[in-house]
From Swiss-Prot:
Record GO terms (molecular function): ATP binding; metal ion binding; NAD binding; NAD+ kinase activity
Keyword field contains Ribonucleoprotein: no
Catalytic center residues: 45
Protein name in UniProt: NAD kinase
EC number: 2.7.1.23
Record-level GO cellular component terms: cytoplasm
GO BP terms, alphabetized: NAD metabolic process; NADP biosynthetic process
Family as reported in the entry's similarity comment: Belongs to the NAD kinase family.
Tree of life domain: Bacteria
Cofactor: a divalent metal cation
Keyword Zinc part of the UniProt annotation: no
Annotated catalysed reactions: NAD(+) + ATP = ADP + NADP(+) + H(+)
Enzyme class, UniProt record, top EC level: transferase
Lineage: Bacteria, Bacillati, Bacillota, Bacilli, Lactobacillales
Organism name: Pediococcus pentosaceus (strain ATCC 25745 / CCUG 21536 / LMG 10740 / 183-1w)
Amino acid sequence: MRVAIYHSSDEHSIQVGKDLAKILSQNEIVIDNEKPTVVITIGGDGTLLSAVQKYLNLLEEVRFVGVHTGHLGFYTDWREYELETLVKALKSDGGAEVSYPLLNIDVTHTDGSHISYKAVNESTLRKLSGTMVADVLIGDNLFERFRGDGLCISTPTGSTAYNRSVGGAIVHPRLEVLQMAEIASINNRVFRTVGASLIMAPNETITIRPVPSFHRTYNFTADRIDLLDKHVKEVHYSIDEQKVKFLKYRHTGFWNRVRNSFIGSIDEV
């Protein structure tokens, strides 16, 4: 086992990273930030998302585990005072894992160039100013012409993030699906959209094709990647063949995560 430590930039997380490195060394576990088999993130969910982006080329070999140093994270299963217990669990690791779908994103520009991204949670496309007008294709078929602030495409694990904030459904990650949620769509007697989030089968794809206009600067996001782009021709979304893998021995069940994150404790009647 080779372990990488990926921490947030705040002083507390940096210190927790140093403490963890010391405990790992004491237990003769190799620290390797270049070619790890386990990546331990220290911080919050944002830190874990950044770590996935850093190790995209190693997703087949790497499993992730999160230590949260602030508020309870959706992806982080351990607290900073449990480092000794975490290392003991690593030493007895049997290779068990739980995997979640990844979003594959292909951006085509007006000059014909392509850029690909992957996301654990979601991707959004919004117009920087004014109403975004875009054709939405499901597969090769035109589904609707959208007018509004933008669109959010999420994975099942990402369904609890921004997707939930814009009224999308929460989806269990064992369902390897895409979800498209509208961001402030325009619906009246002249302009209509479906007005609800759409959940796609694993083999279906979504393409957003903005209608050309004078003001065509778009805000594109993929997890923590946030870009302004003036040359977007279309954005194509699908479920990626790869998955992101997490250590299983302390991995909280999905619906327990949802309850802990959004509801909290419940007094039984």
